[in-house]
Structures are given as structure tokens and as C-alpha cells.
Amino acid sequence: MPRRGAPPKREIPPDPVYGSVLVQQLINKVMKDGKKSKAEKIVYNALSMVEERTGDNPVTVLSQALDNIKPRLEVRSRRVGGATYQVPVEVPPRRANTLALRWLVNFARARREKTMGHRLAGEILDAKDNIGASIRKKEETHRMAEANRAFAHYRW
């Protein structure tokens, strides 16, 4: 563990097209092996498809989808006297955002559409409508927290 405390959180600059930090975070999540320009093409393609299908501002649709995906509770392992308990804890806002983006991208990759742009657009639209794999993941996380509610007093 570092003796100097936690390093400062880096500020993420907004993306050049939409001027949104959220879109930039999505681009960074989609990026593989440092290929940012490829990730940008995929995300901008997906957002233009979202705009085409909904007729709304794609950034508001994306933020709405992420709000639907963000978990409020999760379980963390806590060891107490030789036994490991799954303790439900509230998710901090920054982590909720990160988890939502991670789930969105991972489940988009698992879809069967032809291109990653189509997959990402489909997953964003599904999440906006409260359906899809990323929403199921959030509900599963909440179910786990609810099932282990008895261990909530072990919270730290």
C-alpha cells in the first residue's frame, strides 16, 4: 500500500464531437490495445445510429441508459472469524458509473449484431428501455445484495 495516500483522480477531458466527458469515458472503455481512433469511430458510429433510431440527442439517451444500468448496491467479501460473508454495501457514484460503462461495453461485445457499432447502439437502446443484458446484470447484483441483507451489519 502506498504511504503517501491515494493518488489524485485524473480529470478526463470531454470528447471533441459532443463535448461530453461521458462519451469520452465510453470511448476509453471501448478502446483495446491503445487504438483510440478505432474506438472513437465505433462510439461515434453507435451514437449516430442511436440518434437515427430515436431522433433524440444521443448523449442524453446514453446518460439515460447509464442511469438505468447503474447499481445502487453491491456485495463485497468480508472475512469474519474464518468465515467469508458477502456484505451488501452502497455503491459510490464514481464506481456506479464505471460499472455501468463496463457492463454496457462487455454485454455489447457479447451481442450477435454484425459490427461493434451496431452492438453498442443496440445495447444503449435496450438499456434506455430497461431491457437487455446489462440491466439483467444490475438486477442480479441487487438480488445478491438483497439476499445477503442479513450480513449488512458487517459493513465497514
Curated annotation (Swiss-Prot):
A Pfam family: Ribosomal_S7
Recorded GO MF terms: rRNA binding; structural constituent of ribosome; tRNA binding
GO CC annotations on file: small ribosomal subunit
Gene Ontology biological-process entries: translation
Record keyword Nuclease present: no
Function: One of the primary rRNA binding proteins, it binds directly to 16S rRNA where it nucleates assembly of the head domain of the 30S subunit. Is located at the subunit interface close to the decoding center, probably blocks exit of the E-site tRNA.
Stated family: Belongs to the universal ribosomal protein uS7 family.
Protein name in the entry: Small ribosomal subunit protein uS7
Organism name: Rubrobacter xylanophilus (strain DSM 9941 / JCM 11954 / NBRC 16129 / PRD-1)
Lineage of origin: Bacteria, Bacillati, Actinomycetota, Rubrobacteria, Rubrobacterales
Gene name per UniProt: rpsG
